[in-house]
């Protein structure tokens, strides 16, 4: 018998099939570097920096930039930003630099060059006969990297916001230690011609390398980071939200997880804390894993850990936090159940769950719980089984324990209390809800609740 086959009838005809499904569509890639080789890219021939500067600057003024030339120039210009490594720098077993070493952004990565010449079509700027100064190079590098940040701003009605951000960044690169090299609004005009450049792997890679360098090295031109800072923890919104959440509620990650009372958290918690990653290591390649090409499908994004993401932002909504009210709900990750969990969580100022305990301190606690469940003995009801949880204030340490919180939810039938709903409605009443946001979900779901 083939254990992989299933047999059935279709119109009285016996059919035998071996069900096979797409697998790689769902596979997340962890960023850990196992071969101890630095992240790398391949670019064209190393350009003459004077020629490249003139070509790129004239292209910027004409709002016509070649991404290959821009990447080649950005990589070549890395030698201009030398700094001193403050401590021994190691990540994933790779020795990046020793304390006191002179390093540049190029030290962090491997950049391979071919013999392919760039276009370097000097359509303008021929009046620049002298060599560009380092401040001029720094200004051009900074403006080019700002294109990355601008291309990451997406969504409706972002026109004015994007223009304001572009103007502020432009101002940075026309004041000391930088120098003005383009006219006002040039950056925004250029961006419109390069609106999707954040999707270009080599450009994203170089932005990440510059950011990783300036994030650690004290440097005269560290303000270049204004355009690259969005590469830090990119596609990591799920893990970043969880980190901010446990800081807000003043619990350790281990303590907070004990309040995640829903089965669907299991896979996500396992995914977020995969062994061998450097999630807690400062200045690790992990921080820039997306831009450096170490992961195609992030296991730490909001979609990868959607239940955790939904829960945390429902708690934020309960607290009236604008960021949470504006965040986009992951519709496929039980938003109704997560809103119940978030209501209790918010009331207690930390974790609350829905329907069942799923995480335990150790194996014995898990076994004790399963034994109690199997015999239908709900031992957790013993301490406050007579409490009317809608009228009682719970602020003692005992009532904030995972056992007490879980009991309270079960006593209310896994539903929000009237006080939770009133709180949700009140904190979002004066907020202009964005489409598909948590605020819109709460308005639609609870504003007309008869309770």
UniProtKB/Swiss-Prot annotation:
Keyword flag DNA damage: no
For the keyword Flavoprotein, the answer is no
Protein name per the record: Nucleoprotein
The UniProt function text for this chain reads: Encapsidates the genome, protecting it from nucleases. If expressed without protein P it binds non-specifically RNA and therefore can bind it's own mRNA. Interaction with protein P abolishes any non-specific RNA binding, and prevents phosphorylation. The soluble N-P complex encapsidates specifically the genomic RNA, with protein N protecting the genome like a pearl necklace. The encapsidated genomic RNA is termed the nucleocapsid (NC) and serves as template for viral transcription and replication. Protein N binds protein P in the NC through a different interaction, and can be phosphorylated.
As for family, the record states: Belongs to the lyssavirus nucleocapsid protein family.
Alphabetically list the UniProt keywords: Capsid protein, Helical capsid protein, Host cytoplasm, Phosphoprotein, Ribonucleoprotein, RNA-binding, Superantigen, Viral nucleoprotein, Virion
* Localization: Virion; Host cytoplasm
Q: Which residues cross the membrane?
A: none
Sites bearing Phosphoserine, chain numbering: 389
- Modification comment: Phosphorylated by host.
**InterPro entries reported for this sequence:** Rhabdo_ncapsid, Rhabdovirus_ncapsid_C, Rhabdovirus_ncapsid_N, Rhabdovirus_nucleoprotein-like
Where does it sit, as one GO cellular component term?
host cell cytoplasm
Can you name one GO molecular function term for this protein? RNA binding
* Broad class of the protein's primary localization: virion
Q: Which domain of life is it from?
A: Viruses
Q: How does it assemble?
A: Homomultimerizes to form the nucleocapsid. Binds to viral genomic RNA.
């Amino acid at each position: 018998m083939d254990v992989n086959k299933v047999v059935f009838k279709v119109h009285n005809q016996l059919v035998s099939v071996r069900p096979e499904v797409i697998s790689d569509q769902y596979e997340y890639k962890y960023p850990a570097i196992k071969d101890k080789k630095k992240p790398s890219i391949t670019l064209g021939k190393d350009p003459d920096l004077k020629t490249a500067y003139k070509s790129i600057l004239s292209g910027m003024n004409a709002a016509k930039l070649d991404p290959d030339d821009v990447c080649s120039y950005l990589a070549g210009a890395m030698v201009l930003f030398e700094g001193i490594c403050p401590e021994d720098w190691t990540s994933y077993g790779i020795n990046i630099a020793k304390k006191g070493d002179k390093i540049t952004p190029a030290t962090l990565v491997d950049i391979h060059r071919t013999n392919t010449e760039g276009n370097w079509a000097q359509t303008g700027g021929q009046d620049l006969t002298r060599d560009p100064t380092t401040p001029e190079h720094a200004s051009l590098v900074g403006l080019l990297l700002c294109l990355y940040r601008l291309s990451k701003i997406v969504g409706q009605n972002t026109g004015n916001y994007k223009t304001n951000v572009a103007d502020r960044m432009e101002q940075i690169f026309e004041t000391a230690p930088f120098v003005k090299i383009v006219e006002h609004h040039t950056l925004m005009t250029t961006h419109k011609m390069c609106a999707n450049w954040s999707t270009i792997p080599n450009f994203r890679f170089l932005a990440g390398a510059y950011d990783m360098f300036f994030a650690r090295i004290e440097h005269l031109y560290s303000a270049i980071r204004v355009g690259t800072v969005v590469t830090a923890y990119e596609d990591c919104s799920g893990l970043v939200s969880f980190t901010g959440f446990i800081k807000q509620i003043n619990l350790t990650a281990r303590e907070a997880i004990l309040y995640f009372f829903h089965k669907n958290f299991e896979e996500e918690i396992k995914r977020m804390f995969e062994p061998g990653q450097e999630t807690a290591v400062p200045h690790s390649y992990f921080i820039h894993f997306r831009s450096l090409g170490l992961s195609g499908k992030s296991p730490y994004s909001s979609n990868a850990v959607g239940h955790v993401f939904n829960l945390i932002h429902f708690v934020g909504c309960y607290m009236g936090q604008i960021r949470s009210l504006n965040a986009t709900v992951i519709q496929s990750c039980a938003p109704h159940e997560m809103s119940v969990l978030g209501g209790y969580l918010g009331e207690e100022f930390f974790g609350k769950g829905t329907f069942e305990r799923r995480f335990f301190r150790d194996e014995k606690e898990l076994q004790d719980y399963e034994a109690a469940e199997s015999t239908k003995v709900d031992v957790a009801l013993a301490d406050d089984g007579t409490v009317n949880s809608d009228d009682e204030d719970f602020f003692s340490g005992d009532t904030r324990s995972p056992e007490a919180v879980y009991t309270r939810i079960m006593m209310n039938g896994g539903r929000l209390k009237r006080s939770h709903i009133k709180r949700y409605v009140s904190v979002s009443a004066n907020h202009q809800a964005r489409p598909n946001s948590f605020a819109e979900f709460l308005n639609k779901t609870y504003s007309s609740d008869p309770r």
